[in-house]
Every structure is written in structure tokens, then in C-alpha cells.
Amino acid sequence: MCKGLAGLPASCLRSAKDMKHRLGFLLQKSDSCEHSSSHSKKDKVVTCQRVSQEEVKKWAESLENLIHHECGLAAFKAFLKSEYSEENIDFWISCEEYKKIKSPSKLSPKAKKIYNEFISVQATKEVNLDSCTREETSRNMLQPTITCFDEAQKKIFNLMERDSYRRFLKSRFYLDLTNPSSCGAEKQKGAKSSADCTSLVSQCA
């Protein structure tokens, strides 16, 4: 985790530059997020305007609130990237996209891609699943359906909820959003109810 410039590895410093682009949320005109029509598994660029303190506080109520908000998801993903453990949220996102597929002919190739990337023995971003869930998901690959990853996705969600989500709420990635003054928001008149994420990347900048 990035705690200060002096103790950071070079890889963290490099990844921080990417975070600044990915976390370009919070311009100055709106409290809403612009939802992109497509998602790239690699660092999706999220363009959020400003996030109200009320919304930020909701993120602490549940992981579901956090990752179903465009800006919350971006902040959580950046936090996981700083810990080199973003494979879980990437898998969750891939499962969400998979369930939106309308064409039956596209299910099988997409399912195999997700399986090979996150679940197979040689997966490039293998997620931590128990043997029973892994075997069940492997059997589902014989005839992929829209629900073939449901159990695996649920297990990974529960894992994030118990572990990384709790650490996120104690991290600067979240705490700086709950304290706008630490980001210089007090200098902006009329911005008392909104959070600025500049300091989200300050630990690595």
C-alpha cells in the first residue's frame, strides 16, 4: 500500500501516473457521473464531475453501494491496484458485463475468455476460489449460460467485502474523499458538500 513517497517502489510511482488519468473524476460543475457505454478491462477512464458527501458516505454502508457507483468503483479499483490485487474487482466487473450479453452465440467465447483469464489453472489473473466453486464453474464451461459465473462471482464479492473493502474504508483513497478540506476544497466557495479526489493519488505522486 502506498504510504509515503520515501518508502514507495518505482512501480508504485509509475502506477500513480496512470491513476491520475483513471481518477480524473471531480471536475467542478455537476454532482453526477458520466457513465461510459463501454468498459475496457484495462484501466477504464471514468469521467465524474463531483461527488456529494452524502454519496461518499453511502459507500461506507456497503460494498454494493460502492461498486455500483461509477466513481466509487474507480476509487476502489485504484486502491486495489495500489495493493497489486485488482484481479478480484476485474473478475467481478467481467461477470457483470457477461450477464448483459443478449446474443446466445456470444456467451461461449466470452465465458471461455473470462475462465481462462481468472479461473483456470494457468489464469493470468487467477482469483482465489475454493476447489468446489472452481470445479463447478469448470463444469459450467461445457455449456455456458448467463448464470455460469454466478456462484464464483458471489464468492469473490464476499471475499472483497470481508477483506479489501474494509481496508479501503481505512485508506487515504476513501478518507480523503470524506474530508474535502484535506484536498483544498475549502478554497472553493460553494464546494462544502462535494468531495475532491486530488489527494487520492497524492501518496504516490
UniProtKB/Swiss-Prot annotation:
This is Regulator of G-protein signaling 4. It comes from Mus musculus. SMART domains: RGS (SM00315). PANTHER family: REGULATOR OF G PROTEIN SIGNALING (PTHR10845), REGULATOR OF G-PROTEIN SIGNALING 4 (PTHR10845:SF184). Transmembrane segments: none annotated. Expressed at high levels in brain, moderately low levels in heart, and very low levels in lung, liver, and skeletal muscle. Inhibits signal transduction by increasing the GTPase activity of G protein alpha subunits thereby driving them into their inactive GDP-bound form. Activity on G(z)-alpha is inhibited by phosphorylation of the G-protein. Activity on G(z)-alpha and G(i)-alpha-1 is inhibited by palmitoylation of the G-protein. The keyword Phosphoprotein applies. It comes from the Eukaryota. Residues 62-178 form the RGS domain. Either Cys-2 or Cys-12 or both are palmitoylated. Phosphorylated by cyclic GMP-dependent protein kinase. GO terms for molecular function: GTPase activator activity.
